[in-house]
């Protein structure tokens, strides 16, 4: 299969990369998104070598479950061992032996195919396009704010940052809170928030050396 993989120093396009050999569900990748985590991996995060990419929508090509074949799916990226206490409790993302799609010990979505356990996959209805479905994984990350904080409608909420994840978190917070201020440094990104009723503060200084 065609795949773009990271060898620890650079990204390489390989037109003859081996297909996934896991005894799992095989998914043909329709679309894959580029995440900030992917860029961090290029700078050494997780010391990962392999195929990057964990935001995807694809079509099931091979499965032990005939009903899954041909279905469009997105996937949870953490695959647990299914034997430890965390996995038994349904907390695979805390499994000490887990693999993480495109991040830890598991090839990702920047390829023609990927594989995941069927339990990690979620079927996408026809009413949702591939272009929308590819955002399911980052949107799920944004919804984790509800696990971390019990939001109250009367709260005044500040979101620091105007990147993609911050934008998604704001949309999640809007479901509960109406008084939201976003602090950011990119005027073009903040303008879109103003149109949706979000207050903005422009001028956060970057801490990056670049």
In which residue ranges do the predicted regions lie?
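Residues that mark the start of a beta-strand
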Residues: 2, 24-26, 156
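Extracellular beta-rich ligand/substrate-recognition surface
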Residues: 3-11
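Cofactor-binding loop segments of dinucleotide-utilizing enzymes, especially the Rossmann-like FAD-
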Residues: 8, 30-32, 162, 185
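Cytochrome P450 core scaffold surrounding the K-helix E-X-X-R motif
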Residues: 37-39
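NAD(P)H dinucleotide-binding glycine-rich loop of Rossmann-like/cofactor-binding domains
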Residues: 82-160
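Mid-domain Rossmann-like dinucleotide-binding core that forms the NAD(H)/NADP(H) cofactor-binding site
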Residues: 128-204
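Short amphipathic alpha-helix with an adjacent loop that forms part of the alpha/beta core around
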Residues: 204-210
